[in-house]
Design a protein with these regions (language model features):
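Pore-lining transmembrane helices
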Residues: 10-105, 118-119, 141, 187, ...
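Membrane-embedded alpha-helical modules
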Residues: 128-210, 221
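Short, Lys/Arg-rich, polar N-terminal cytosolic tail immediately upstream
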Residues: 1-10
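Juxtamembrane membrane-interface segments at transmembrane alpha-helix termini
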Residues: 56-62, 85-90, 176-181, 199-208, ...
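Alpha-helical transmembrane segments and their membrane-interface exit regions
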Residues: 51-54, 78-85, 170-176, 195-197, ...
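Helix-loop-helix junctions within the multi-pass membrane cores of secondary transporters/permeases
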Residues: 3, 73-164
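Transmembrane helix-loop junctions in multipass membrane proteins, especially transporters and channels
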Residues: 30, 34, 38, 92-96, ...
């Protein structure tokens, strides 16, 4: 089979959990945008250009209330600052992807990062091709689902209670899968423990960045200690 076709096939199979998650959350976003007075085209454009998931839901409130550009920018920075940590993991891969590098940085999300981490055993070139197609497919899922939700929201009333839990379910599934595939569980236990403490200290709206900083510091220190031994 053609290497690019094989990479696309592999990326599609790996992206199925993301598809299931993005389908419901993207539609929810489109419906909420429609309820706020924005048509399906606005949902499609925002998802294609902004593509930040959780922040897009916050953006609905900002757009409806006429928030300042500064407020929107600062909120976006804090809500998406964790992506800079994700990108560090794949810097060597992105550097080898030429003109696609900037798109890969733009399209790196929580979900694509988690799935990319499962591709580490592939040969470098195959891994990079698979990562690229995974990014494109995931971007398409989110954008298409947002537009579809905007269209359906115009004609069908929806009860959105509990729809956001599908994202939690996705991450629990990925966590369990990674736990079963690896023999060293210290990173997972460190991240889980720090996240629980940070949640208790900083609250649901402010725990993500501190948890990432502390977990990263622990893993860097542990890696240096292991290397010295």
């Amino acid at each position: 089979m053609n290497p690019k076709k094989e990479a696309f096939r592999r990326a599609f199979i790996a992206s199925v959990p993301i598809l299931c998650s993005y389908l419901f959350l993207g539609m929810a976003y489109g419906i909420l945008m429609q309820e706020a007075g924005f048509g399906w085209a606005a949902s499609l454009l925002t998802s294609a250009v902004v593509y930040t998931g959780a922040f897009q839901f916050v953006l609905i409130t900002f757009l409806s209330s006429g928030a300042s550009i500064l407020t929107i920018a600062v909120t976006a920075l804090f809500m998406n600052s964790r992506q800079s940590f994700y990108a560090l993991t794949f810097l060597s891969d992105f550097k080898q992807m030429g003109r696609r590098k900037l798109y890969m940085i733009h399209a790196l999300t929580d979900e694509t990062y988690a799935v990319n981490c499962t591709l580490e055993n592939l040969p470098p070139e195959e891994r990079r091709e698979t990562m690229f197609y995974l990014a494109v497919l995931s971007h398409f899922y989110w954008t298409a689902a947002s537009a579809l939700g905007g269209m359906l929201g115009q004609i069908i009333p929806f009860d959105m209670t509990g729809i956001d839990f599908c994202m939690t379910a996705l991450f629990v599934t990925i966590f369990v899968d990674q736990w079963e595939k690896t023999r060293k569980h210290m990173p997972a236990l460190a991240g889980l423990s720090v996240a629980i403490v940070a949640l208790a200290v900083f609250g649901a709206n402010g725990f993500m960045l501190p948890a990432l900083l502390i977990t990263s510091a622990i893993l860097v220190f542990a890696g240096q200690k292991e290397g010295s031994q």
